[in-house]
Each structure stands twice: as C-alpha cells, then as structure tokens.
C-alpha cells in the first residue's frame, strides 16, 4: 500500500510506549462500558478485570447514554444486536462523541447480515475512536461488500489494508484488522503486531475481548493508534504466555486470564514485536 508507511517499533519519538500505557491503565483502572454480545459478556468482563480495568455491562436504553458520558471508554460490539441493544448502542455512541469519551466499534459479521450491517454503517458515521474487526468485516464496512462467513473472516489481512485506510481517512478513526499478524492504521501510519497465538481463534470471545482491551487502553492515551497498538501487544503477548501451558482451548482460555493478570510492563517492553 503506497499510501501507508509502516512504522518502526517506536511510533513517535519521545512518546509513551506500550509498556508505559499498560502501567497507566493499571494505575487508573479505567471504567469500560461494554455494549457487547450475549455470547461473550462474561469472558469480556473477566478479561478487563484481569488486565486491571473495571467493566460495566450497561446496555439498556436511557441508561447507556448517561453512562457513556462518565465512563472512561465505551465498547460497542454488534455480535448479538437485539432491538433494545441496538437502541442503546446508538444512544451511547452519540453520548460518547458529545462527551469526548473514547469508544470502539466492533462490527461483528457486518456485510453478512442486514440488521447489523445497517447499524454498523450508522455507527461508523459517528467517527468511533477505533474500529476493530477481521479482514472481511473491515472490507464489508468500507465497501458495502458481503462480508465473511458469519463472524469468521474469509479474506486475508493484507487484502483489507486499502479498505482499512479508506475507513480511517473517511471517518477520522483508527482501524485495527485482526489476523495472524494484526495490522493497525490511521490512514497514514501503519503498524503490524507480530505477537499472538492461533488458540485465540478457538475461544469464543477471543477477538471480541480485544475490542474491550482497546477501549481500556484508548482511555490512557490521546493517540488512538498508539493505544490500539499497546492493547494488541499486551493482549497477544498474554496469549503467547497462555499458549505455552495450554493443553487445549479450555485451558488456554483460563490461562489467558491468568496471563493478562501477570503480564508486566517490563515483559511487554521485552516481548513486543512491531513492524
């Protein structure tokens, strides 16, 4: 992609590192409002708690907007968008935008299903701080394509970079494309994160929880690209640690929570691999 210039390990000289942002997160214990899908609610909350953030599953209309104004960050995940939650998501997105609260959009299965596709396009027009999805979701959101196979990607990450750049520049957002190597761009800078384990794809909520982690990190830094990179690095380094002792997806899921609790800024500094 000629429009994007890959960054080196240090995104901007003299600015906080991923390790610094993890330390800030644990000191601040950000309050993360999660409007997320019913399948992953418990796992997402546990991931945030293990990391050092405070989850709040506030997804009821008339409550979601006021809460978004006081939360440290808001996650909107479209995995199971029933009617009441759709209303709450739009309400929270407007409130977050008006209050300056960072918020993350995870457009699960956009393009594949009509209700969430319409909702995703309505929400992305409100300029989320970060959009996180797999390659097929990002392509569908940017181009109006058909998307992947439900929640699963059918496109490679590299194939989504033009779409990610277009989304980022059009809506003034950072776009994180998840895959074997995560790609994160603001339409001008591009960072690749080379840590992570395939076990993440075998645990329900493995990707959705990353959106919540990005929300927590977005509250620690005014540069959402840097926050998204730090979130991805911290989460995937913990996944690598968990995979070392895993016997299967069940032990990996439990091990991931333990690793998120145990991962230190020093370990992130030593283990982070960016290009």
From Swiss-Prot:
Pathway: Cofactor biosynthesis; thiamine diphosphate biosynthesis; 4-methyl-5-(2-phosphoethyl)-thiazole from 5-(2-hydroxyethyl)-4-methylthiazole: step 1/1. It comes from Clavibacter sepedonicus (Clavibacter michiganensis subsp. sepedonicus). It comes from the Bacteria. It catalyses: 5-(2-hydroxyethyl)-4-methylthiazole + ATP = 4-methyl-5-(2-phosphooxyethyl)-thiazole + ADP + H(+). One of its GO terms (biological process) is thiamine biosynthetic process. This is Hydroxyethylthiazole kinase. Keywords: ATP-binding, Kinase, Magnesium, Metal-binding, Nucleotide-binding, Thiamine biosynthesis, Transferase. ATP binds at residues 132, 178. Belongs to the Thz kinase family. Substrate binds at residues 57, 205. SUPFAM superfamilies: Ribokinase-like. NCBIfam families: PRK09355.1 (NF006830), thiM (TIGR00694). Signal peptide: none annotated. Gene3D superfamilies: 3.40.1190.20. CDD domains: THZ_kinase. Pfam families: HK (PF02110). Its cofactor is Mg(2+). Catalyzes the phosphorylation of the hydroxyl group of 4-methyl-5-beta-hydroxyethylthiazole (THZ). Its EC number is 2.7.1.50. GO terms for molecular function: ATP binding; hydroxyethylthiazole kinase activity; magnesium ion binding.
């Amino acid at each position: 992609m000629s429009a994007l210039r890959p960054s080196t390990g240090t995104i901007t000289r003299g600015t906080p590192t991923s390790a610094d942002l993890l330390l800030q997160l644990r000191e601040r214990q950000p309050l993360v409002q999660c409007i997320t899908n019913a399948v992953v609610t418990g796992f997402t909350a546990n991931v945030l708690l293990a990391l050092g953030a405070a989850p709040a599953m506030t997804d009821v209309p008339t409550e979601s907007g006021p809460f978004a104004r006081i939360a440290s960050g808001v996650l909107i995940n479209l995995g199971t968008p029933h009617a009441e939650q759709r209303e709450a998501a739009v309400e929270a997105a407007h409130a977050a935008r008006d209050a300056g609260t960072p918020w993350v959009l995870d457009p699960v299965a956009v393009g594949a299903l009509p209700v969430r596709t319409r909702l995703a396009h309505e929400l992305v027009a409100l300029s989320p701080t970060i959009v996180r999805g797999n390659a097929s979701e990002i392509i569908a959101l940017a181009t109006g394509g058909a998307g992947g196979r439900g929640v699963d990607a059918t496109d490679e990450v590299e194939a989504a970079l033009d779409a990610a750049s277009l989304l980022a520049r059009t809506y003034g957002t950072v776009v994180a494309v998840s895959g074997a190597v995560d790609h994160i761009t603001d339409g001008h800078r591009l960072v690749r994160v080379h840590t992570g384990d395939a076990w993440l794809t075998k645990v329900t909520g493995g990707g959705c929880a990353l959106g919540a982690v990005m929300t927590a990190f977005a509250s620690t830094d005014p540069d959402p690209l840097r926050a998204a990179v730090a979130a991805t690095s911290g989460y995937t380094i913990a996944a690598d640690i968990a995979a070392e002792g895993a016997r299967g997806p069940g032990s990996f899921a439990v091990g991931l929570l333990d690793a998120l609790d145990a991962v230190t800024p020093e370990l992130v500094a030593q283990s982070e691999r960016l290009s």
